[in-house]
Amino acid sequence: MIRHTAMRLLAAVMLLAAACEKDPDPQIRISVQEILLPGNATGEAAFTVTADAAWGLTYSGEGFSVSPSSGSAGETTVTVSPTEANTEKSRRQLGTITIHFFAGKQDYGIPVSQRPATASRTVLLYMPGRDLITFYKENIAKIREAVTAEIPGDGRMLVCYQPRQHATAEMLELRYDPSTGTCESIPLTTYEDFNAGRPEDVQQVFTDAAAYAPAERYGLIIGCHGKAWIPASSGVLPRSVRPGTVSDVWTPVPGALPTRSFGDTGYELDIGELAAILEALPLRFDYLVFDDCFMASIETLYDLRTAVDYVVASPCEIMAAGFPYDRIVPHLFDEQADLRTQLNEICREFWYFYQYDWDTISGNEQSGCISLAVMSELDALAAEMRRVSSAAKQDFERAELQYYKGGNTKLFYDLGQFVALSCGDAGVADAFAAQMERAFPTGQRYHTPNYYSAYNGRLNPISYYTGVTTSEPETTEPYATDCRQTAWYRATH
């Protein structure tokens, strides 16, 4: 009796063990929780279904197609294609894809939506040249960090740079991919015969940006070497080595930290050429952000006054690391803020980074000056400057002026202080200062206590700051003569 009972218990244990060792329940994995289709009718999106058994799908809604409609055990790629463009101003919900997992007797819904064919805003970051390529790649990496499911939202973020050589350029889009949960680089086009110093090539890049990413509004960032209004070398010797010029003008001192001032000689545009390019485009950029040195120069900005609405720029050198793109990109696509607020936040983020976080990047310095120019106010500023030029003069020492470039040849002096020191008519000087406030609002003038210059290799104190420079006080040739040929000087004297 005892033996029979033991045998029955053993059999029960064996049956229980067998039950525990039965095949596990079939599993299915779907790589996305939602599908976001491009706004036009030519793109597509894809996701993968990985399953232990057969599955099928159905979909409801309109404006898209799905293939294939079923799969077996293993991994299957499913492609979702829009069948028409989204002509609305915002995303539209197209429908739902439902995955039917027969073995598991479960259904999985995936919502499908489509971006607008015309983006709310397209921003192009144009970074020509090769000398700063390491920093350009770091800038792109920072943008990738900023791109999420919400940023740029229904906007488009494009980049054009020269990762291979001076004779080629590549344009790509940085876009969030729901299937991977990361920012992806989408190649748009390659330019095989490209010269950043050739106006027609640059114009083509800007035109293509609108063709590949049409938008209601456009923004432009130019990140490269900058020398304000100083004429480009255009393939000839730079001015710093021409006979009769001061040899140190564009030569950094030994051991200087890298800034965005020097390099890529022979691949430069004059500011007048850039203005002509922008004026000729079939689109208009609302703003231009210069991630370049010295571009907050009145001689420079006056040439651009009818080409864009706003310019963000620095009166001094910008460290080679450039703007903190992970911090400014969210503001560029902030649909809840007006444009002036967005641009103020860009200025503030630039200053904050160089004021407090500059040492998070090797080879950096606590040096960041920035301002916002309201371009529609520059003609009125020129009119006030004509009154200054005609008014009584008062003597001052040029050494009193706040300058923004190291070395023996300073070149760039604070415009507001120059007028305050040189104008002998208090009423005229006050009227000029009032117009300066409209053209360069105080609330968008930011600076660190000092600025770094590679031309003397050190930090230089800032005691007076209006956010914009002039080269009129410069006496060194040929710059003194060249300055008198600028449109700003001719309009104000």
Regions found by a protein language model. Name each.
Residues 2, 12-37, 65, 102-118:
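Bacterial Sec-dependent N-terminal signal peptides
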Residues 25-30, 50-77:
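Surface-exposed binding patches on compact interaction domains or structured appendages
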Residues 77-94:
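Extracellular/luminal low-complexity segments enriched in Ser/Thr/Pro
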Residues 90-104:
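A short beta-strand micro-motif common to beta-rich folds, especially ectodomain repeats
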Residues 116-215:
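N-terminal extension/subdomain marker
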Residues 129-132, 163-167, 193-194, 224-230, ...:
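Solvent-exposed loop/turn segments at secondary-structure junctions
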Residues 162-188, 222-265:
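Surface-exposed loop and adjacent secondary-structure segments within mature catalytic domains
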Residues 246-493:
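Terminal, contiguous helix-loop blocks that mediate binding/assembly
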